[in-house]
């Protein structure tokens, strides 16, 4: 079905989405998905405006526009809604109608039926999807700006005119420059260093016992900083650009993301996932940079780690894809970011007939790169050895189009601001060859860009 009310307009003037988001009057449930690193992965930036439907999962409860729904589950409602509301997108843009939002790691844990031994210390929904009437989309490759309205909250032409007028007014506005003032921060980890190293040793013991082959071990940092979340976001996107970043502003919490990792992209029934395993910091000189890149390229430990996750992701996709369609398209690729190198693989397949995003999510979430193999047992070990719940960290943030397509990241390099504190998870994959000191130091390297942005 094609929504005949939908209007898509290319603006005569190119205005970056980051500037528009910064200077437009804020709205409740504001979400900005940001491709600040423009490459083959970072192509579009998306702003949602005029929300009309909010789906939330809070533990075992499901809410539609803040009203509890008891007659159907979140997953079944989403599956049914996507089937009933399926709408063609005739444009080249990633979506013309649909939702932006997130799924937390805790959503995935409950989806897998794994109980937690930890108390809730942070109160946010496990999953949020917000369907918007209007979108502002930047084609970061072509440097073009688009407005889309669907005529749900008010006539599409009227809403388009309002948005266009508001945006054109911003073209003369100077965007607020990233804050240069340095803020003191205090960082509190939920592990002492030696305790974290012991948990890694315990995880390695489980590997030798045959319980697991690989698992992801993380620690949680709580940071006290007076810097505003939106200032953190704009500093982070400037100094550590990423293809899958974002800023999500909800009632009592905000999410700042600079993820380099794609979890799921679904395009006309074709599924892609790109797990990351293997990290090296960037060098301070060109010579050191090249040495560290080569070190990662030649690391048998990191390649072995990634291969195990590739096998897991292939198995997950085979549950939901057409027989024989799942293939490894990219085995060991080095991706460069401002502070680190990553080792990445690509796995693709064709979604089985009569399946949609809800089925894909249930078959694959949470991602294998941030859990381990076998997934269920690895997640049990994670709950036993980590010192608290992960909450949003290692979940997914992205968009869901009503034409059936989607693109979701892995929520790493992601900080949650709630009740005046920032919460940051950092971790890495553990194998039989892991060295506890190296793994601990790697978590600090992964935290560096966000800790810098918080100052």
What are these model-predicted stretches?
Residues 1-455:
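Extended alpha-helical targeting/anchoring segments
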């Amino acid at each position: 079905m094609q929504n005949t009310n939908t209007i898509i307009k290319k603006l005569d003037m190119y205005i970056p989405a980051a500037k528009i988001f910064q200077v437009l009057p804020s709205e409740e449930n504001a979400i900005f998905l940001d491709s600040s690193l423009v490459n083959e992965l970072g192509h579009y930036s998306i702003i949602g405006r005029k929300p009309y439907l909010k789906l939330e999962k809070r533990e075992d409860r499901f809410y539609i526009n803040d009203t509890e729904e008891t007659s159907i589950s979140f997953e079944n409602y989403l599956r049914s809604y996507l089937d009933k509301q399926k709408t063609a997108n005739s444009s080249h843009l990633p979506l013309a109608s649909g939702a932006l939002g997130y799924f937390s790691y805790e959503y995935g844990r409950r989806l897998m039926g794994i109980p937690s031994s930890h108390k809730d210390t942070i109160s946010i929904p496990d999953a949020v999807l917000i369907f918007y009437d209007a979108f502002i989309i930047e084609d970061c490759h072509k440097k073009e700006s688009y407005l889309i309205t669907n005529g749900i909250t008010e006539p599409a032409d009227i809403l388009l005119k309002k948005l266009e007028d508001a945006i054109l007014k911003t073209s003369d506005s100077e965007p607020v420059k990233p804050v240069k003032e340095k803020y003191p921060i205090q960082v509190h980890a939920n592990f002492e260093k030696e305790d974290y190293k012991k948990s890694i040793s315990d995880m390695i013991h489980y590997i030798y016992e045959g319980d697991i082959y690989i698992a992801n071990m993380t620690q949680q940092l709580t940071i006290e900083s007076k810097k505003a979340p939106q200032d953190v976001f704009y500093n982070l996107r400037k100094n550590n650009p990423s293809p899958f970043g974002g800023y999500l502003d909800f009632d009592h919490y905000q999410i700042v993301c600079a993820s380099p990792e794609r979890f799921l992209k679904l395009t006309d029934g074709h599924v892609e996932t790109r797990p990351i395993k293997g990290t090296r910091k960037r060098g301070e000189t060109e010579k050191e940079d090249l040495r560290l890149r080569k070190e990662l390229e030649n690391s048998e430990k990191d390649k072995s780690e990634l291969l195990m996750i590739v096998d897991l992701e292939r198995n997950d996709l085979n549950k939901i894809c057409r027989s024989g369609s799942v293939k490894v398209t990219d085995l060991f690729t080095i991706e460069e970011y401002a502070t680190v190198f990553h080792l990445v693989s690509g796995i693709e397949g064709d979604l089985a007939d009569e399946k949609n995003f809800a089925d894909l999510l249930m078959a694959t979430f949470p991602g294998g790169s941030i859990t381990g193999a076998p997934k269920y047992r690895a997640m049990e070990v994670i709950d036993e050895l980590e010192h608290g719940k992960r909450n949003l960290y290692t979940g997914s943030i992205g968009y869901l189009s009503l034409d059936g397509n989607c693109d979701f990241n892995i929520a790493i390099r992601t900080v949650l601001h709630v009740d005046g504190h920032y919460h940051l998870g950092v971790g890495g994959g553990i194998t039989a060859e892991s060295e506890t000191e190296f793994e601990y130091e790697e978590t600090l390297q992964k935290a560096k860009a966000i800790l810098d942005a918080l100052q």
